């Protein structure tokens, strides 16, 4: 905070827009404070004047003040200097931009080269984005070689003949050089034009000349560009002219930016930037000197280059092709660029993420005895962190105590560290000596230590999802670690092996409210990621739950009673035991009956439930049945208590609420842990030992496996193995061995598992689900199994072995890493080694994966961080682009979604009819579920039948739509909001529905109710066509579920709901549906990114070829995810899934035909061998094998081939028969292809398809006739033939589609919806390909183009377009994520897909995608390419409107997200019901401030006269709509805090000088009371009517009749000296207590209660109901309270009736009743702004500390009765005069708004109205006393 401005509690105004630009040389000079001339920093130990550490630039030394702003080191921000460069220099960041501009304009006259009429130029003008526009213009200009328009004069004649002369560009005709950049130079190349008549020989010298362009030359070109041209080029001449991109003046950053470090007492070590600047200054001086001395050009250019180099490296020291500037040590200097860049740079390291105060970090330890939303905090932390609490009447006592304890409270207590006064002064309680300094007033802030129950944020890095930061309530505990409940570890992903976690203490009410409402642990139990809970019962508690709920668990009385003690809600009633004789015993299930909430119904199965067991209660007790909160049957295990979808925790959270779920998790732990403690559980080595028979079985299994492997090896070596499709023989062998060995391990394991007894402790843990799995048991007991590296068996490391002592090429199990021992038996050394290899790979994988997924997550978050739900329900980003019209297409929040079953989908037609259709036409139809009269209606009334027919046909169309459009895969469970089935079950239980009785509902009612309900379930309100359509789409799926579940026949027949139960269900569905809608302001982009990124961290990095997944290998896991979101051009395993037409897909043969047609077959793939022979006689041959077929071929030659033309060289190709058959090729086909390809250049003969060997013989045909030159030719022929051979093998396609390298056939199950029988599944054949060529494949006639798809996104967008690619993207993401069994809710994936596709092209989630958006430069630069983006932003003068998250975080503002997205308004209606605040008398200790003796002017009678009602009772102040802080129940004591009482805010309309409330003529001065009229003598301070001795206060007030005994002037309470009379007591004004915490009104002896105040008389005019004197804050205004009767003798101020216990305080006092007039709508007292922080006095340039309420303070001189402000004749009081009359001695000094305290001249620094300790009369008082006080000072004339 800058000390030059007075303290202000007001909020700092928000930055609305950030404008980027380039500083012009003039601006740099103007904003600088000095011209830096010297490169030295210090001289004789002092900063050198004019040097780099000049004190005018700002100070970095605590002892030195800044010369410019006179602030100290902490406050001075630093001031820039500047350096005049000897020559202009290039700015390295703008080189490329300057080059582009130079290429666009004429080198000579700076006009744009392109013609404005040109088409390209016009295109460019349409582009808004300046950077792209420049690119386009450059495009238009790049071919121009000269500046058009100059030569027009020469060709004037030609124009006359042409069409009218084109408007000349006015160019200069100069030839344009070709510009390039080399390093730091710009180079211009001129092409020298030869004149036509020149002889070519005459110019021997080169026809080009190069010249280096200095920045000065470029600058002169850029300076000439006109402003209009700048705009055309996309620059903004106001903020960034092109010529400013060249440095003429270098700004010198102040020392605070480049601080130096003290090495020892004398020497300082300077920052890199300082060194670099010193170099620049030095070289600049050198250059200047050389120019002055007139050095030769080449020397000057060398010096220029050197300076240019230093300036460049000062900006960016990582330039490509430039040497690094280094320090003496050889370390490269850190340039400005590298300060901004990267993770630790300014943007990401200091703006996006900073270190914060009020945080703590320590190790975590478990504590199952605290609640899940609690956090044990060490005392050492609690006594160090603070929370600022504002002093209010309610907490002042407590805070006083804390302040007394101070920073080092006694053991077991917390204290406070600081007091912050209302003027911003901070008192450190460590150093406060006097107790008077600790004095608290309302409105002060106390920074108190943390207390039990404070809310904090708790976090564990890496914060991968929303639940990594949650809110906890703290509980201070001994020792030094955070204590955490065990159930909360899963969302944090924490364990207690030394993890540390961070705690942050929120520092304001708003933050605490958000923590409490949005982030508390119970609110986070259900996560939107997979719409399931993320917390459940874990570890020993889970094990205990399994053990305690077993059937044979009984609990003794003593244990059960002790267990009850852990139950918080225990009411002393012990539940009845299950067994009474021989002694009372309780079952373990009864413990759960205590803690499951009563409205819960649940039906689930245990993890080990076998489908064969059926019935209500299964033999294995595996069916968990909870009804009405009672566990009736079933053993609880991880499936019920864990984090699965629909688990008990989930149901409790959804049905009863977060708090119930919290209690359940807590109670389960406490009760079960206590029982487990009594019961005990242990596990030892004995639990892993299997019995001897099992061991024999295991050994047998393993030896069998070994035999099988030996067998495989024999087959493999004998080449007898059949290769599997798509695999080589070796792959096949490895795969088979792996299968055999894995099966052996599993079999051994399962036999071991079966042998373990029910009592086995290891098994207990596995079945409960608390630790371990089936595979762990089998590895411990039976056999560890095969060790893999990279998904294969351990490879041969060297020389055909894995380890040296195995034989060569040993493929046996032992040698290749099969561990046959169990952990129990121990591993042999080589087994141990292989096991270590496998384990090491896992570690490496994890380490590599972490960084990969971390980067993916960061990119996802940056791409989607600004996507949120707006108030119209649409999903948009910060630019306002619509990403989705409804979140997840249905507008539901993922948290409230559950998986529900669509019953009608799987039903056969007959079942469907039985469930939904009334058989009305059947004669004998006599249903048991309808009452007789309803049945008559159904049979008799025609209209009713139409209703039911309509219902039935709707259900039928629903079912058809589900089967054909929605759930095409036949899956009947879908995530939908509102679990209807469970609501029905709850209703049956709540309303005690008897399933044997008939329902009293008429079926028509049900149909109507459901129809009406559907109309009420609005997601998109509005009745225009679009809204209606959108609403229909959004709710279609849910309505289908609703209609089929609440079909009238089902309600009557299945659920038997009574009318009231049915209505309850309907109501419940409606309210739950609306609750499930997503909240506007929700940042779903971030949630989506986290929901995708978090499962990615759990994925495996390299996915191996899983044994038997499929023949084709697909990339999965992280690499595939990376490919998808990077939109990779070349993916690792491109592949098509080709579906065939029904005919082709029926049989394998059909599929085989298509496979052959698609697979790209080259000659090579069917060739066995090729040979080149010299075979001189074409008609015969020297190869015996071929002799026969050649002769027979030429016996009947096809065409006339002259043998002499045939080359003697022969290419002989032997084809592979199997492949030919497989590919369905014939010899003739191949020969035909060859002839087509090579025409008559080759001759080709082949043998029969059935011959033993298939041979092709190919020879070259030579055109030359006779073999005259035989020798030479044949030499070339064989070479040529070899070339042809290789070409043929690779290039020649025999058939198939290019790029489709392999095609595999596989059989898949296909489910198809069938009207009659529900879903039918059938097998069909389909093809998988390696390689992609979607377009060509889809053209094949047997391929089904609708289903065929590719995994290559770019191909899909090219072939099928953007909508198709969105769907493909979704499916691909689905595949990757669900591959290892994860599930992510659809809406998150949808947000990602829509983000990537909504622009109409695929936006990769990389810097090339995200940063090419039109978001603000600040947001883009926080991702990647920081410096480039900022430089571009400056060059093109971009603006950032700060609409995103990142930008606001950088500026430290509240981003428009979540709660920051809306404005808050006050509900005036609610205020009428606010509760009045009765202040207790807590002020005794502060009375000293009040005694008249201490009040400097209290003795004068006039002073007492000041009580005159004109001042106190006039309702004027209440007219101010803003001035109601007076009433808010809160403010009672805050009145002294400038931040609390808007009533005084200078901007309050009530204070405007013209406000009628202040003009004495204002009717507000109740006309019935002459005492208020300005002409009334009562105004004159000497008026006897007001003199304290006057018997009557106001002639019109009957209750003042002088005869009233208690008013008699002799009444003791009247004595003017009575302290209780101290006129300064503001309690006389109806606004009273709210204004003065020090008011005696709070002390029991206070006169505030004395009847002398007219305000107490019930008949007093000031009581009129509109009169504010009903101040709710005044404790004693109840007119009917007995103690107020005017005649009541108990009025003496000392009367006990005033003690705070006085009945007057009783809340039943009518003044609390809402009918009390003070609650009337006219009562301004409840105003929105009440306790808010109104800026009130804060702006006054004068003494900041005087709170606006000060006029009441007894010590304040304002009260001096001589002050003219009280006399109507005072000029400053004249009613017509605005209060700011120039004669007002003070107002001149302050701007009108500030006047309330203008009177307090700034020389009153220590004056605090209530602290008499510091009070000294200053000039201010003297003026007051002399009567020159300005009216505007006191409330009356207050502006």
UniProtKB/Swiss-Prot annotation:
The molecular function GO annotations come to: DNA binding; DNA-directed RNA polymerase activity; metal ion binding
Q: Where is this region: Bridging helix?
A: 829-841
Q: What is its main location?
A: nucleus
According to the UniProt entry, which residue ranges have a biased composition of type Basic and acidic residues?
156-166, 1818-1839
Q: What broad class of enzyme is this?
A: transferase
Which InterPro entries is this protein grouped with?
DNA-dir_RpoC_beta_prime, RNA_pol_asu, RNA_pol_II_repeat_euk, RNA_pol_N, RNA_pol_Rpb1_1, RNA_pol_Rpb1_3, RNA_pol_Rpb1_3_sf, RNA_pol_Rpb1_4
Region annotation Disordered: residue ranges? 152-174, 1538-1839
Entry EC no(s): 2.7.7.6
**Which biological processes are named by the entry's GO terms?**
transcription by RNA polymerase II
Q: Region entry Alpha-amanitin binding: which residue ranges?
A: 785-795
- Which Pfam families does the record cross-reference, listed alphabetically? RNA_pol_Rpb1_1 (PF04997), RNA_pol_Rpb1_2 (PF00623), RNA_pol_Rpb1_3 (PF04983), RNA_pol_Rpb1_4 (PF05000), RNA_pol_Rpb1_5 (PF04998), RNA_pol_Rpb1_6 (PF04992), RNA_pol_Rpb1_7 (PF04990), RNA_pol_Rpb1_R (PF05001)
Q: Where is the composition biased (Low complexity)?
A: 1538-1726, 1747-1798
Domain comment text? The C-terminal domain (CTD) serves as a platform for assembly of factors that regulate transcription initiation, elongation, termination and mRNA processing.
Q: What is this protein called?
A: DNA-directed RNA polymerase II subunit RPB1
Q: What is the lineage of its organism?
A: Eukaryota, Viridiplantae, Streptophyta, Embryophyta, Tracheophyta
The gene name on file is NRPB1
